[in-house]
Regions:
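Active-site-proximal alpha-helix that buttresses catalytic centers in soluble enzyme cores
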Residues: 5-247
Length: 247
């Protein structure tokens, strides 16, 4: 029997609180990331504590409406399972195993890396589930993963999928979902809502905004609706800095 190449696929996502009492620690992890609050540690730590504490009551109300927790882990695990089945079906020369790593809640990189070491792969593929690249999302997750591998002295051939803002299947999936919702084009506005970023991140060269624009333009093009009324907006602004807009 031929030996299969063992390939570990690491799927990165943000994570979310699994219960209401974890909303504040989740928010702290989010804002204590230097890619989010670009400040020295001794400033960032207390500021992250303060922001998390201030935002927790509002965030808790939102999670309450979602049933008391974030659905992101369950949905990402479903994606991971479906991808693993498809990869093993499509490539008979390799044995694929998918692992989920969350940046701001569990499962964290430091725990998942131990499972990957046990799996003992010949190759690792890093796959952020953010279609558009930003240093604050994909960049931060990849950086943390590399740091954890270094700490565990774990060296394996690794390749990284950066981003896929105009991938045809990604565009097609959006088109399908949008078409399902269009009841009457005469009284219809399509609002694209992407997560915002501070403007200074973009000015420093972060490609996120133009990749979001690329995604939206491709989706609009694929819909092929004459005089479609659409707009791109950005959400979730935090702190005093100027963020990209319109909000």
């Amino acid at each position: 029997k031929r030996l299969l190449m063992k390939k570990a696929v690491i799927l990165f996502n943000l994570g979310g609180p699994d219960k209401l009492e974890n909303v504040e620690p989740f928010l702290f992890n989010l804002f204590n990331d230097p890619a989010i609050l670009n400040l020295p540690g001794f400033f960032r730590f207390p500021l992250a504590k303060l922001i998390a504490n201030r935002r927790a009551p509002t965030a808790k109300k939102i999670y309450q409406e979602l049933g008391g927790s974030s659905p992101i882990l369950k949905l990402t695990e479903e994606q991971s399972h479906a991808l693993e089945i498809k990869l093993n079906k499509d490539d008979e020369l390799s044995d694929y195993k998918c692992f989920v790593v969350m940046r701001c809640w569990h499962p964290r990189a430091e725990n998942v890396v131990k499972e990957v070491i046990n799996y003992n792969p010949d190759e690792i593929i890093l796959m952020p589930l953010y279609p558009q690249y930003s240093a604050a999302t994909s960049g931060s997750s990849i950086k943390e993963w590399n740091h954890v591998c270094l700490k565990n002295n774990f060296k394996v051939k690794t390749s990284t999928i950066c981003c896929y803002p105009t991938d045809k299947n990604f565009v097609e999936a959006h088109k399908t979902e949008i078409i399902k919702k269009i009841k009457n084009l005469d009284n219809f506005k399509l609002i694209f809502s992407a997560h915002g970023l501070p403007e200074k991140n973009i000015k420093k060269g972060d490609p996120y905004q133009w990749q979001v624009q690329q995604s939206v333009e491709e989706i609009v093009k694929s819909l092929n609706i004459k005089n479609l009324d659409w707009i791109l907006s950005y959400q979730s602004r935090v702190g005093p800095l100027k963020w990209i807009g319109p909000s």
